[in-house]
Amino acid sequence: MRLHELSPAPGSRKDRKRVGRGDAGRGNYSGRGMKGQKARSGGATRPGFEGGQLPIYLRLPRKRGFFNPFRIKYAVVNIEQLNMFEAGTEVTPETLLAAGLIRNFVKPVKILSSGHIDRALEVSAHKFSQAAKAQIEAAGGKVQEIDYAAEIE
C-alpha cells in the first residue's frame, strides 16, 4: 500500500450540494421553488410566525405574579420522618444530615406536618409550620427555632 492508494471508506464522505449550476438536478431555482418570500435571500420567517394569524404565544394567557429572587429555599422534612428517631432524642440539622433526611447544610431546614408523630422529641430547626409545632408539642416533645440569619453571618 502506498500513499496514493489511500482513499476514505465508501460512504464516509458526501459531496456538498452544488445548486444553480445548470439545468440538470438542482439548477435554475436551486431547490427553492418559484417566486415568494422563501425564494428570496433572507426570506425565512421568524420562529413562531404563523402567516399573520395571531400566534399561539399571544393567544395563550400569560403567567402572572411576582418571583422573588431573594426568597429562602428550605430543605423540607415532614414530621412522619422524625419517627425514625428514638423517643427523647435531640433532633438537629446535624442529626437529620446523618440520618439522610437532608442532603447538606446549604438550605435551612423546615419541619412540615405531613403524617403524625408518636414520640416525644426535642426538635431544633430553622422553621416550623404551625401544625408541625403543635403536633410535636402534643406528643410531649419540644420545639426550638434556630436563627438562620445568625448562621450566615
UniProtKB/Swiss-Prot annotation:
It comes from Dehalococcoides mccartyi (strain ATCC BAA-2100 / JCM 16839 / KCTC 5957 / BAV1). Signal peptide: none annotated. This is Large ribosomal subunit protein uL15. One of its GO terms (biological process) is translation. Keywords: Ribonucleoprotein, Ribosomal protein, RNA-binding, rRNA-binding. The gene is rplO. The keyword Ubl conjugation does not apply. HAMAP family: Ribosomal_uL15. Belongs to the universal ribosomal protein uL15 family. The lineage of its organism: Bacteria, Bacillati, Chloroflexota, Dehalococcoidia, Dehalococcoidales. Coiled coil: none annotated. GO terms for molecular function: rRNA binding; structural constituent of ribosome. Binds to the 23S rRNA.
